[in-house]
Design a protein with these regions (language model features):
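C-terminal motif of bacterial Sec signal peptides marking the signal peptidase cleavage site
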Residues: 14-15
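Structured soluble/peripheral alpha/beta segments that form catalytic or ligand/cofactor-binding pockets
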Residues: 18-318
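Sec-dependent signal peptide recognition
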Residues: 1-8
Length: 318
């Protein structure tokens, strides 16, 4: 039996407030009809452009790093089709002393570039380029008030997706690829127009879909971290009552040699939550908790507890 208990300072909790979504009948999520055809080998095109600018489609490439000085940096390149096309980059930078910088900047369509064969995303002089093994990420200080990044992310863990990485309910879907579950970060960071060398550990994933997230999920809880040589991802997504009200849990444990254990869906994996979060979210928000426990029927147990809120943002306020 492997038991992993993680007491951490960050836990990503995301929730969708109760919104009126109209009277449309939605197709239920069916656990037996989830895509599982791609096999275990993940190819570079899976981190390339996956959407076609159809209405309601969205896609983002996400990166976060915990630097050796204790700082946390987050970068995400978004594209959304909502009647018209929207393109933006978001950055967050938090230092141990409480100093914080965050900004979202929009770009014109003519200033963007994407490739389908691999991850090559460029917004003006900012880019997110890689091949599942090595990535170059650049944030131009001229676009972000003197804050910038020019770094390399080198994967130490192979990419992962549960089955095909797609959660679908009829024709509606949300997809996730952990392109770099863990990696080494090296490069330069600019803050207040002063450049320093940085190093640390980092993570990159890629998400896309064709319907608003709040029309698929009530809420979700997600974690990524390390214990010794192990890289761990744990999560639970909860579909809306209109989609059947299903819980979709998952667990991933790997080291440099490969996957040690992974499980996804409702096949012998169980979750419980503790420590209701109060005083942080709106009253009509779904109940969210700061502790997640995941237990599998083959005796893997993961316990995650968040002890500090670093950032609290409304996901759909852009």
């Amino acid at each position: 039996m492997i038991k992993l208990i993680l007491i951490i300072s960050t836990l990503l909790l995301s929730g969708c407030s109760n919104l009126y979504l109209g009277s449309k009948d939605y197709t239920d999520f069916d656990p037996q009809l989830q895509a599982n055809q791609l096999g275990n080998t993940i190819l570079p095109y899976e981190d390339g452009l996956r959407t076609n600018s159809k209405n309601k489609e969205y896609e983002w490439w996400y990166f976060d790093a915990k630097l050796d000085d204790g700082s946390i940096a987050v970068v995400y390149f978004w594209k959304i089709k909502a009647i018209k096309d929207f393109y933006y980059i978001g950055v967050n930078y938090n230092k141990p002393d409480g100093t914080e910088y965050k900004k979202i900047k929009f770009f014109k369509k003519n200033d963007t570039f994407f490739e389908k064969d691999s991850c090559n995303v460029q917004y003006n002089n900012n880019h997110f380029i890689g091949n599942l093994e090595k990535y170059k990420i650049k944030i131009n200080p001229d676009d972000f008030d003197g804050f910038g990044l020019d770094i390399e992310l080198n994967a130490t863990i192979k990419p992962y997706r549960p089955q095909d990485g797609i959660i679908n309910a009829g024709k509606d879907y949300f997809a996730w690829l952990a392109a770099v579950p863990n990696g080494l970060v090296n490069g330069k960071l600019t803050y207040n127009n002063e450049e320093i060398n940085i190093s640390g550990s980092g993570y990159h994933d890629h998400n896309w879909g064709n319907i608003e997230l709040q029309k698929l999920f009530d809420d979700w809880l997600w974690f990524r971290g390390t214990v010794g040589e192990y890289t761990i991802i744990g999560y639970e997504l909860n579909t809306t009552s209109a989609r059947g009200g299903y819980s979709i849990p998952g667990i991933f444990i790997a080291d440099s040699t490969g996957i040690i254990y992974e499980n996804y869906g409702q096949n012998g994996i169980f979750t419980s939550k503790e420590n209701l979060i109060t005083g942080l979210y709106k009253k009509n928000n779904e109940a969210l908790f700061s502790k997640l426990k995941i237990l599998t029927n083959d005796n893997f147990y993961l316990e995650i507890e968040g002890v500090e809120v670093i950032e609290n943002l409304y996901l759909f306020d852009v």
